[in-house]
C-alpha cells in the first residue's frame, strides 16, 4: 500500500479510531510507557502517534514529540494535547520513513503498532535508529 492511500485510510478513521481501537491497544501502550522508566527531561519520539491515545500516559517531566503522516489523526492528537494541557508535547506531520530530525535527536523512540502499517518498514526502522542517540532505546 502506498503512503497516500495509507494517509487517506487513517484520516477517514480518525474521528472514530479511539472508539474502535482504543481498548484493543490500550494495554500494550500502557505497558510500554509504564516500563520506560523515563528520566526527567528525557526526549521521547513516538512514531505513529495517531490520535494521541498514549500521550496522557507519558510522564510530564519528559519532552514528547509525536509524528504521524495522517493529518486527520494528528488533528485528534492535537485536541487531546490541548484538552490535557500537555505543554511537554510537540506534534508533527511527517513520513516515518524520511524523518526531518537530526541524527541522535532522541533518548527513546517508541513505535507501537507502526511497522505493519507503513509501505517500507525497513526505512522506518533505519530512520528510528538514525534519530535515536547512541545508547538510547528503541521500543516497538
Language model: regions and residue ranges:
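Class I SAM-dependent methyltransferase SAM/SAH-binding core
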Residues: 45-98
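A short acidic, Gly/Pro-enriched loop at the edge of an enzyme's catalytic core
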Residues: 97-109
